[in-house]
């Protein structure tokens, strides 16, 4: 992946092009964004692993929603009770549930059918491998997580109203932080640098469990904040966004010493 010619993975002027233009820097980061965006679309084994799990997440969310309804009450009365449940902030559970889609995508990002092409990371002048990871994560966030989150957010806003908007913004920023912390604490793997068949289910399960623990901690803190001091939520948003900025910067500054050797 050459820094001198980042247009290698440059698509036509569609959605990916516009997102990369506004949210990535030229060079390794933007090239990785294009690469991950297109491999997610084209890699057959990756899609067979990713999309069924995304569908499962959606089904489980529907199951949780409908099992919370009482059969002996009208649907509208059930909705009214649901709005009041958990101090009126029960929607945070559904909002943070969308993290399952992101955790699944991140756990699969290192694997690809053409993993032997990973030697290019070392052969070409990739000076900041951390930017490759950041570009890949941004592609997954916009390609996988954001559409799922927008669907859930539209449902939440239709039921709970605009009072949930500040919380949803905070959930989105927190979710990006959660994904970056999980990827950083897990072993660093460059995008599509390993074979599908050597993927260890236990390692992926551990990564998903780690993300769930972080989600529980951050989501629980958010719930307490929204329940007892809701006026602090809009104040917290710029503070958390600033923390995300420095986290991304720290990730981009990672050197090759932070990465495992690619065995090709």
Where are these regions (language model features)?
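Hydrophobic alpha-helical transmembrane segments of membrane proteins
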Residues: 1-121, 128-264
């Amino acid at each position: 992946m050459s820094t001198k010619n980042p247009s290698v993975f440059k698509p036509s002027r569609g959605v990916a092009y516009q997102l990369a233009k506004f949210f990535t820097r030229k060079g390794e980061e933007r090239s990785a964004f294009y690469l991950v965006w297109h491999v997610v679309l084209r890699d057959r084994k990756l899609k067979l692993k990713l999309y069924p799990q995304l569908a499962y997440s959606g089904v489980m969310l529907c199951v949780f929603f409908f099992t919370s309804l009482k059969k002996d009450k009208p649907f509208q009365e059930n909705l009214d009770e649901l709005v009041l449940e958990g101090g009126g902030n029960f929607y945070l559970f559904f909002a943070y549930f969308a993290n399952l889609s992101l955790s699944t995508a991140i756990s699969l990002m290192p694997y690809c059918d053409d993993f032997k092409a990973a030697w290019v990371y070392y052969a070409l002048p990739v000076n900041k491998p951390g930017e490759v990871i950041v570009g890949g994560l941004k592609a997954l966030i916009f390609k996988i997580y954001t559409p799922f989150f927008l669907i859930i957010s539209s449902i939440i806003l239709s039921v709970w109203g605009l009072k949930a908007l500040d919380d949803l913004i905070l959930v989105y920023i927190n979710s990006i932080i959660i994904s970056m912390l999980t990827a950083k604490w897990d072993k660093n793997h460059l995008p599509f640098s390993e074979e599908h068949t050597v993927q260890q289910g236990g390692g992926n399960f551990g990564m998903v469990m780690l993300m769930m623990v972080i989600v529980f901690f951050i989501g629980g803190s958010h719930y307490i904040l929204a329940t007892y001091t809701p006026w602090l939520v809009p104040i917290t948003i710029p503070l958390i966004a600033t923390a995300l900025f420095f986290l991304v910067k720290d990730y981009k500054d990672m050197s090759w010493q932070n990465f495992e050797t690619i065995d090709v």
